[in-house]
A protein has these predicted regions:
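Membrane-embedded and interfacial regions of multi-pass energy-transducing membrane proteins
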Residues: 2-639
Length: 639
């Protein structure tokens, strides 16, 4: 095994050979420039950045669809959108938000930040990382292309059978949905496997499991949840595709199938997905609160255990969505208990944050404002969640706008607000520029006001009986005034998000130079330049506490690992529990094979919509691409 050493003899950059060694590292870890070379990048920061930017674009597109639906619903018997187009917009909005925005952007944040936070130079499988992004991008582009050519799915983002079956949805749109959902989840699974391997085996020496940043813990829990939650929805979408294309009748009662099987498979994924989205946001909140209170998080162990508990308990909630399907009430009672029980670890998180904030001199910068807004919105969403966990109450409000209100309070308040706080927080690290505080405060104010103006009145609509998933309603129902008010609120909410997008855009060129650690934070990503070099760290740091930067500043010294080659893409491997140095792994260089493999797999998946023979074509093309990917190369061919 190659030997590495730990030294603490002052700043390495002060040595005479530092410039030459840095230049060698720059050449070794270079990401090729140019448009064609864009398809060969494997660096984790570039791939993570692409995930984040692409997800935000899909978020904006889903928002536009939502505004169009609100315009349709702002007055009774409106004819702006017909029922078919409304159903397409509704399906595309939900599918985009759940599959193309929420999970990918959380994975993208993990891909970008986790290697920096744990003190390593790249992900465990860089080419697999790139492959996952190209799969995700291809699926998203094809799904939105289906909308523009009139082939979009229209049976809802949940694709309930028999409505999503061939008999009631004969159009090709649902074939597109079933195929692309399976395809998209390949991307999610590749990222999850990579993140687990990277976190367990590439932490800097000394970063034992009980010293990991809470965001890294959150990403680890999220990754394991993805590994267990995504296969059921992939199985369900494949079975539905076989029903539609080969008349297999898994969900057709006349053929011996069972429609409720779809709901069991889908919601076994669907409810954990809410927490797949939420758990990384909880980690973001902890990192931001630590920085802006200038104190370690209160109850670190309790915070970690509550994250793990959320991951476990979330898999026992799927029948929470099926209280009105006729299942035995004795069985439903257990899911009511589980639905109430998951509030306990969530409450532990909130009380630990409050304890950290209590008595602190808080800096009320924009990231912190988004976190404080989260507290108010998420608590409301959590309270209504406990309400719909009660079977008698759920029977009354199921499939009404009360559930729409609850759902959006939890996901926008619980995930999107912390996410935008995290974007303001880590934007200086990614770009080297600070975002405008003035625009950030205005954006937060509009988002917070617009969110409440849009979704709080929906509780009342639901209690008055307005069903969700309808494209119009009669004037005599008396829902017109509230819907008009909600539509106005939706445009205020959209203006808030648009202001943040504008802030991101102009700050790239007009923002103040950030420096390496503008927030005076404590975690390792702030020990690098902004933006970091392609290799992240000139020397791998040694971690001695949960707040390494603060403690190194107090001790006025910093221990570093030496011995890794500057001429090869080497990373340090450490033990799983205590992060003791164990070995060195040589990573592959940039290549176009992940992009070509993604295209080959896409041809097989998308082509099968029109002919089974495309699967054969995609299979053989994928085989040749994998051979090219894995073909051994001599050292000079890796340059």
């Amino acid at each position: 095994m190659k030997q590495t050493r730990i030294r603490s003899d002052g700043p390495i950059s002060a040595r005479p050979d530092a410039d030459e060694a840095t230049a060698t590292l720059d050449r070794t870890w270079l990401s090729p420039p140019g448009f064609v070379s864009w398809f060969t990048h494997v660096n984790h920061r570039k791939i993570g950045y692409r995930f984040i930017v692409t997800s935000l674009i899909f978020f904006a597109l889903a928002g536009i669809l939502a505004l169009m639906m609100r315009l349709q619903l702002m007055s009774p018997e409106n004819s702006l959108l017909g029922p078919e187009l409304f159903n397409q917009f509704f399906t595309m909005h939900g599918t985009t938000m759940m599959f193309l925005f929420a999970v990918p952007i959380m994975e993208g944040m993990g891909i970008y930040l986790v290697p920096l936070m744990i003190g390593t130079r790249d992900m465990a499988f860089p080419r697999l990382n790139a492959f996952g992004y190209y799969v995700y991008l291809t699926a998203g582009v094809v799904l939105f292309a289906s909308l523009f050519i009139g082939m979009a799915p229209a049976a809802g983002w949940f694709a309930y059978v028999p409505l999503a079956g061939k008999a009631f949805s004969p159009e090709v749109g649902m074939d597109v949905w079933t195929t692309l959902i399976t395809f998209i989840e390949i991307s999610a699974l590749t990222a999850a496997v990579e993140l687990v391997a990277t976190i367990f085996k590439q932490r800097a020496p000394g970063m034992s499991l009980d010293r990991m940043p809470l965001f890294v813990w959150a990403i680890l829990v999220m990754s394991f949840m993805i590994i267990f939650a995504m296969p059921p929805v992939m199985t369900a979408s494949v079975l539905l595709m076989l029903d539609r294309t080969l008349d297999m009748q898994f969900f057709v009662v006349a053929g011996g199938g069972e429609p409720l099987l779809w709901q069991h498979l889908f919601w076994f994924f669907g409810h954990p997905e809410v927490y797949i989205i939420l758990v990384p946001a909880l980690g973001m909140i902890s990192m931001i609160i630590t920085t802006f209170t200038r104190r370690p998080i209160f109850g670190y162990t309790a915070m970690v255990l509550s994250l793990v508990a959320i991951g476990f308990v979330s898999f026992g909630l799927w029948v929470h969505h099926m209280f009105t399907t006729g299942l035995p009430h004795l069985g439903l009672s257990f899911f009511t208990a589980a639905s109430a029980m998951i509030t306990i670890p969530s409450g532990v998180q909130i009380f630990c944050w409050i304890a950290t904030l209590w008595g602190a001199r808080i800096r009320f910068a924009t990231p912190m404002l988004f976190i404080l807004g989260f507290f108010a919105i998420f608590v409301i969403g959590g309270l209504t969640g406990v309400m719909v966990a009660s079977i008698p109450f759920d029977m009354q409000v199921h499939d009404t706008y009360f559930v729409v209100a609850h759902f959006h309070y939890v996901l926008i308040g619980g995930a999107v607000l912390p996410l935008f706080g995290a974007i303001y927080y880590w934007y200086p690290k990614v770009t080297g520029q600070m975002m405008s505080e003035r625009l950030g405060r205005w954006s937060f104010g509009l988002i917070f006001a617009g969110l409440n103006l849009t979704f709080f009145p929906m509780h009342q609509l639901g209690l008055e009986g307005m069903p969700r998933r309808v494209y119009t309603y009669l004037e005599v129902m008396g829902w017109g005034s509230l819907n008009l008010f909600i539509t106005a609120g939706a445009f205020i909410l959209a203006a808030g998000f648009a202001l943040s997008f504008w802030n991101m855009f102009i700050s790239r060129t007009r923002g103040i130079n950030a420096g390496p650690n503008p927030w005076q934070a404590d975690s390792l990503e702030w020990a690098t330049a902004s933006p970091p070099a392609n290799y992240n760290f000139r020397h791998i740091p040694v971690v001695r506490s949960r707040t390494p930067i603060w403690d190194d500043e107090a001790a006025d010294e910093r221990q570093l690992v030496t011995g890794l080659s500057n001429e090869r893409r080497e990373i340090l491997l450490t033990t799983v529990l205590d992060a003791e140095p164990q070995g060195v792994l040589i990573l592959p260089s940039p290549t176009i094979w992940p992009f070509l493999l993604a295209i080959a797999v896409a041809l097989g998946f998308i082509g099968i919509i029109f002919s089974p023979w495309w699967f054969v074509v995609g299979f053989f093309l994928s085989f040749f691409m994998i051979v090219g990917w894995l073909w051994p190369r001599r050292p000079w061919q890796e340059e």
